[in-house]
Amino acid sequence: MAKMNLSSYILILTFSLFSQGILLSASKSIRNLDDDMVFNTFRLGKGFQKEDTAEKSVIAPSLEQYKNDESSFMNEEENKVSKNTGSKHNFLNHGLPLNLAIKPYLALKGSVAFPAENGVQNTESTQEKREIGDEENSAKFPIGRRDFDMLRCMLGRVYRPCWQV
């Protein structure tokens, strides 16, 4: 009787392990189908363009170079020289590996990327002071410093009432 229970537990355990592997591979194939559908929707604009035009759509090339393969982002050149790093079903590591050569976000240009280059406008906003009038300390600190002091007071790290900040 004990052997029968033990063999049934082993049978259930092996079935659950194999079913997880099958479900994982099925979910990856479904995810690849969904990704292909998304890429195809962005490529629809290409069909309406002339074939002579060398200019491509802005959205399609940026999305085409990123493909999802075994939970990592690779462009086509890296996909050709990819190596087998072990088991395809790594159940312990579900995170994405870091690949610092690929930048999936767009680089900002001009004053949006570096707001400190705006010069006068930026310095005026940081040097702005609150004008309460009654408090003598209100003109000494910029807004950020006074807000930080108020937060410290509300957290109870300073031994004085909040209205004296």
Swiss-Prot record:
Q: Which UniProt keywords apply?
A: Amidation, Cleavage on pair of basic residues, Developmental protein, Differentiation, Disulfide bond, Hormone, Neuropeptide, Secreted, Signal, Spermatogenesis
InterPro entries xrefs: Prepro-melanin_conc_hormone
Task: State if Disulfide bond is listed as a keyword.
Answer: yes
Q: Which GO terms describe its cellular component?
A: extracellular region; nucleus; synapse
Signal sequence interval, chain numbering: 1-21
Tissue-by-tissue expression: Predominantly expressed in lateral hypothalamus, also detected in pallidum, neocortex and cerebellum. Also found in thymus, brown adipose tissue, duodenum and testis (spermatogonia, early spermatocytes and Sertoli cells). No expression in peripheral blood. In brain exclusively mature MCH and NEI peptides are present. In peripheral tissues a large product, encompassing the NEI and MCH domains of the precursor, is found predominantly.
Cysteine disulfide partners in this protein: 153-162
One GO MF term attached to the UniProt entry: type 1 melanin-concentrating hormone receptor binding
Q: In which compartments does the protein localize?
A: Secreted
Q: Name one GO biological process term.
A: negative regulation of synaptic transmission, dopaminergic
Q: Which domain of life is it from?
A: Eukaryota
Mind telling me how this protein is modified after translation? Answer: Differentially processed in the brain and in peripheral organs producing two neuropeptides; NEI and MCH. A third peptide, NGE, may also be produced. Preferential processing in neurons by prohormone convertase 2 (PC2) generates NEI. MCH is generated in neurons of the lateral hypothalmic area by several prohormone convertases including PC1/3, PC2 and PC5/6.
Q: Which positions carry Isoleucine amide?
A: 143
Positions the record marks as coiled coil are none
Q: What Pfam families does the database record attribute to this sequence?
A: Pro-MCH (PF05824)
UniProt function note: MCH may act as a neurotransmitter or neuromodulator in a broad array of neuronal functions directed toward the regulation of goal-directed behavior, such as food intake, and general arousal. May also have a role in spermatocyte differentiation.
Family, similarity comment: Belongs to the melanin-concentrating hormone family.
Q: What is this protein called?
A: Pro-MCH
> Per the UniProt entry, what species is this protein from, by scientific name?
Homo sapiens
- Cite the source lineage: Eukaryota, Metazoa, Chordata, Craniata, Vertebrata
